[in-house]
Amino acid sequence: MKSPVVMIGIGEMGGVFARGFLRAGYPVYPVTRQIDLAGAARAIPTPELVLVSVAENDLHSVLEQLPPAWFQRIGLLQNELLPGDWEQYGFAQPTVISVWFEKKKGQDVKVLIPSPAFGPQAGLLQEAMESIGIPVRLLASASELLFELVVKNVYIVTTNCAGLVT
């Protein structure tokens, strides 16, 4: 039996990842706002991955509360993520994925391009996402990750500006 994956946040994106982990054979434990993170870490001290998939506005409050037992197992996905977002909390090398697919409520996933991933559990993210037909491209270095995160940020700013014009 495979080690579990803990999901902090189980919205639209979290639900997609949870489905991928389940399809790949990993038990998934969701952690919602009502669940104490320290208690969850005591109950599941050594998960394969702790994937934080919360809304942009909630990311920092979750990272502030993350139990030290999970520091080496953290995975992050966020639209406007940059290294400063995790470095300030002491996470040296989290697993990070820059998501290049859309998921709207009541609609199927729409893949734009393969999502780049880097970090200790990037292969796990690739395995899970590809099990549900979402391509993931593994990166070889932190500098490649930084480049991909900046590209994603530029894309978001550009689409937001374009939306203001129309």
Named regions from a protein language model:
Residues M7, V52-S53, E144, E148:
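Active-site-adjacent beta-strand anchor residues
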Residues M1-A43, L124-S131:
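NAD(P)+-binding Rossmann beta1-loop-alpha1 motif at the extreme N-terminus of oxidoreductases
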Residues S3, Y26, E48, Q72-R73, ...:
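A structural micro-motif
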Residues G14-L22, Q34-K110:
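Rossmann-like NAD(P)(H) cofactor-binding subdomain of soluble oxidoreductases
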